[in-house]
Every structure is written in structure tokens, then in C-alpha cells.
Amino acid sequence: MLFLLSLKRIFIFRNHKFNIVGDVMGIEEEIRRIEEELKKTPYNKATQKHIGRLKAKLAKLREQAQSRGGGGGGKGYAVKKSGDATAAFVGFPSVGKSTLLNKLTNAKSEVGAYAFTTLTIVPGILEYKGAKIQLLDAPGIIVGASSGKGRGTEVLSAVRSADLILLTVDIYTLDHLPVLEKELYNVGIRLDQTPPDVKIKVKERGGINVSSTVPLTHIDEDTIEAILNEYRIHNADVVIREDITLEQFIDVVAGNRVYIPSLVVVNKIDLADEEYLKYIKQKLEEFGKDYILVSGNKGINLDLLKEKIYEKLGFIKIYLKPQGKKPDFDEPLIMRRGATVKDVCEKLHKDFVRNFRYAQVWGKSAKHPGQRVGLDHKLEDGDILTIVIKR
């Protein structure tokens, strides 16, 4: 009897697993069908609404494929964030990500002359100009990673929380760059973009009302309504303050996108001659992203890479001044550009926000020396800050 029950459980488990696989395969087939239809459909005023609906469907299907095919079981890739900011090396296998991590930090990421040496995400800390920057060496991804191939969904999901993406290739694999960008795009990572200035307020009745403060040249009201309907939103007020594209509007409606700056890191430049280096630079200019040429093995341009990472993360230094005392210029607080007094309070102690009375600021962000400000005050590099709390 026990043997029969065990067999039944195994059958149910396997059947459930086959259903999941079948669901994912069905979703992938539908994704391919829509992608083919989009390729064949010319984009014009007459087809804009139809294309908008198709792209909204495609975005929803990709989310379903990731959630169902994200690879259960086994060791996950979650890494606790530490330091002042996080930058993640993302690239195909064997481009030298582990070597770069080891050279820049105190980490020990395994290095090998074959693909897929790194099987988990390896963190390390880069200390530079007073900042502690967490660097992540992610396992190499492959084409189709965003659909779950090679546990790619888990890897890409883990880097969503990074503050900077280091698109890493070597001198022979520049053609990986658009592929990497596409795989990141498919999991909702928008490189070098800012969130569109669009507000959607869902309501109970009244239909779809669209208002814009600028002329819309890439999307019309019918397409906006079609996309919202695809997401089962039939009553909403939409306010648009920039000339957005159809894809940007879908991003706003989906609501799970992250916007992260990037830096292209081209490794192994010690293996290229002058002529080939010219070719590489030309290709990178065409790709249109900020880049740096390095060699992990030979240590070429690694100090410049540290500086680039620091600049891209937009750090500012805040000097704390206890009440009635002199500022501490020896150990500044490292914050990110756009940080507020509240951000500083949260970094210093969990009770500072709750017990906050006021703050005083000296520096670029102050209208006058010692200006009294609240939690929402934005700080600038080099500011001196006094925080006064309830006793």
C-alpha cells in the first residue's frame, strides 16, 4: 500500500513538472509567433494600435515565461547588498569577469580556461576614494538567458538590484553586446534610461482619459487605450509629460522595470595590435555606450576602471558636523547623487528618521550657511550636515 502511495506521489509530481514545462513551451511558442507577426507588420498610423496591443501581449508573456521557467530547485543567486553601492559584471562565459573581480577586490572567484567556471554569484568589495563598492561576478549567461536557459533568469534577476551594470566582453566578442542588452531588456532592465514621466491613476468608472503636456509623436490615444485594455485597465486618468514611445508606455503600465546605468568593459586588450584596437574603438562608438578597454591579466587600465565605476555610480561626500562641534573632514559619509537628509538619517541609524527634529546645511545645496532644512532636502557633494534629533 505504501509503495503504491509513493508511486502515486511520484506520478503527480512528475505530471505537475511536465505541465509546467508544457506551459513554458506553450508560452515560448506564443512569444515566437508574436515576434514573427511584429517583424512582418509595417509600423504606420494604421497599424500602430495593433502593434501596441501585440507588444503589450509580448511583454506579459515574457513575464510569465520568466516566472514559470525561472528554474526551481538548486542553489539560488540572491546576494545580500553591502557597501555604498553595487556594480555587477554581466557577460557571456570566459570573457574574464572573474579575473577582473579578483584584481579589483579581495574576492576569490574561480578562474579557468574554459566556460562556466563561475557557478554562483561571487561578491567582493572595491574600496576607492572612501567608498566601499560591492562588485558581483555573475555566472556567464547565454543566448536565451532571459527565457530561463542556463538558469539565466535567476542570474539576470539577481543583477536587477545592482546600481551599475558592467557589460563585459573581450576583444573577440564585441558582437555579444547587443545580445546582452536584449537579454537584460527582456527581464525588465532598462540600461541608461530614466523612468518615463507618466502617471496612471486607475479609477472605478469614466473610461480612459489621456492628457499630455507635450505633443506625442510616437503614440496616440487609441494605442494608449489598447495597451491599457490588454492589461485589463479600462478606467484610468493618464498624464504624460514627455514624448514617450510605445515601448516606454508599456514599461510604465507593467510597472516592474528597473533603470540602471551601464559601462562597457572590453577585456584582454593586451592581445590586440594597434590596427585591431582602432577597429574595436570604431565598433564601440557605433554601439553608443560609454566604454573602457582593459586587461585583467596584465593589469592594464584597472585604475581607470575603478575611477569610471566611481564616476558612474555618482557618489557624493557629505561631512557630518555634530551640534556645537567642528565638521569631521577625515571620514566623509559616502552617498549617491540625489540623496536627501532622510537618506543620510536612514544610513546612520534606524531611529534617526523617527526622532528627527531638523537639520542644518552648509555648502552648495544651502541657500545660506547653516540653513535649517527638513528630511526632503537634497544634498550636494561637499555639503556639511548637522542632524538634530529629539532626546
Curated annotation (Swiss-Prot):
Its name, as the record gives it, is Uncharacterized GTP-binding protein MJ1326
- Classification via PANTHER family: DEVELOPMENTALLY-REGULATED GTP-BINDING PROTEIN 2 (PTHR43127)
Which SUPFAM superfamilies does the annotation name? P-loop containing nucleoside triphosphate hydrolases (SSF52540)
Keyword Transmembrane helix among UniProt keywords? no
Q: Name one GO biological process term.
A: cytoplasmic translation
Q: Where is the OBG-type G domain?
A: 85-314
Q: Which GO terms describe its cellular component?
A: cytoplasm
Residues recorded as binding GTP, renumbered to this chain, are 91-98, 137-141, 267-270
Residue ranges constituting the TGS domain according to the UniProt record:
314-389
Looking at the Swiss-Prot or TrEMBL record, what is one Pfam family this protein matches? Answer: MMR_HSR1_Xtn
Sorted keywords for this record are: GTP-binding, Nucleotide-binding
Q: Which InterPro entries match?
A: Beta-grasp_dom_sf (IPR012675), DRG (IPR045001), G_OBG (IPR031167), GTP-bd (IPR006073), GTP-binding_2 (IPR031662), GTP1-OBG_CS (IPR006074), P-loop_NTPase (IPR027417), Small_GTP-bd (IPR005225)
Give an example GO molecular function.
GTP binding
- What family, per the record? Belongs to the TRAFAC class OBG-HflX-like GTPase superfamily. OBG GTPase family.
Query: Which residues are the signal sequence here?
Result: none
